[in-house]
Regions:
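A glycine-rich beta-to-alpha transition motif near the start of alpha/beta enzyme domains, typified by
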Residues: 1-158, 166-328
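Glycine-rich ThDP/TPP pyrophosphate-binding loop and its adjacent helix/strand module
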Residues: 162
């Protein structure tokens, strides 16, 4: 009988399953990610596949970093695979490390540097539990013009924030937010996925991670409501949080269009009404792109421990490691 113990927290409503696996081999985090894909995928399946998980299940594997600048290494996964970066999971992990005492709490904000396949990200957790993430450089890749069966021609703005997203501005397209459901947006993402992926491959080396459907709901203060769909075209998943990497990509897009200024806060509201605050704290260059340095934070404490759990796989279980969650 195989068993696996983990800690579960949620950040703004989105779960994070934390498992510790020191000693994952690899000279850098991308090699460690590749090792996990080949040798430790059973961990991902046990923690994100039904019947031991749900469509919202997300995980982070904590291991040793390669860089002397980082405190720990982090590898991210969901039911669709292993990924380079996750903002909500990084923030949830940082909060757990501080609250559990695994990282000594500082008198003010406690700083933690995570090494991820996307790069090193900096987190701080203050005494109230508020967590702030300074993410990897984020930038706009370009636009993809595609046709949908229900809404006609659409412009999808491709932006990177640790993962690559297609940003669909419903205001820009004249789509009434009240007239469209989350299920319809999930179906739309599935329809657009392959077409947008083809455009993305011609513009950058990153694989499309998901779609962010957004609508401006306030100018002062600047607020955006967003639905983030990720996973795969066949099995789209819904982010319950405002998404750290999605908000970073969104910030890069807004900044490139002049909709937000440097150091100006933007409030990002999730599908369930939880919020992240984001702002551009700097400009930088990343490979061939002009990029921004995004800072994403919770307005107050938003990360909570929900479970200390052990999942079990009996040798005669006909479903084995499980099956991918059913679509939205």
């Amino acid at each position: 009988m195989r068993s696996l113990s983990f800690i579960e927290v949620h950040n703004s409503g989105m779960p994070v399953r934390i498992v510790f696996a020191p000693g994952v081999p690899g000279s850098n985090m991308k090699e460690k990610k590749a090792y996990c894909e080949k040798n430790l995928d059973w961990i991902r399946k046990l923690l994100t596949y039904e019947p031991r998980a749900s469509s919202s299940s997300y995980g982070v594997l904590v291991t040793n970093p390669n860089s002397s600048e980082a405190h720990i290494g982090a590898l991210f996964f969901d039911s669709s695979g292993w990924h380079d970066m996750c903002g909500h999971a990084s923030m949830g992990l940082a909060c757990y490390l501080v609250r559990s005492g695994l990282v000594s709490r500082a008198q003010g904000a406690t700083e933690i540097r995570l090494e991820t396949p996307a790069g090193i990200v900096k987190l701080s957790v203050d005494l109230s539990g508020k967590v702030t993430l300074v993410n990897v450089p984020s930038f706009v890749v370009g636009d993809a013009r595609v046709k949908s069966s229900k809404f006609g021609d659409l412009t999808v703005h491709l932006a990177y924030g640790g993962n690559l997203y297609g940003i669909v501005d419903l205001d820009e397209l004249g789509i009434n937010w009240d007239s469209i459901t989350i299920k319809e947006l999930a179906e739309l993402s599935g329809e657009l996925w392959i077409r947008v992926s083809e455009s993305a491959k011609s513009l950058c080396p990153y694989e499309l991670y998901g779609f962010r459907f957004s609508k401006n709901i306030s100018l002062k203060p600047l607020r955006y409501y967003g639905i983030l769909v990720f996973g795969s075209p066949q099995r789209p998943l819904l982010d319950r949080s405002p998404s750290g990497t999605g908000s970073s990509a969104h910030l890069a897009y807004l900044y490139s269009r002049g909709f937000v200024k440097k150091m100006e806060f933007v409030e990002f509201v999730s599908a369930i009404g939880t919020t992240f605050l984001g702002r551009v704290v700097g400009e930088t260059a990343f490979e061939k792109w002009n990029a921004v340095v995004p800072e994403i934070s919770t307005a107050t404490r938003a990360c909570y421990i929900t479970a200390y759990t052990t999942v079990v796989l009996e040798p005669d279980d006909p479903l084995g490691e499980g099956f991918t969650p059913l679509p939205i």
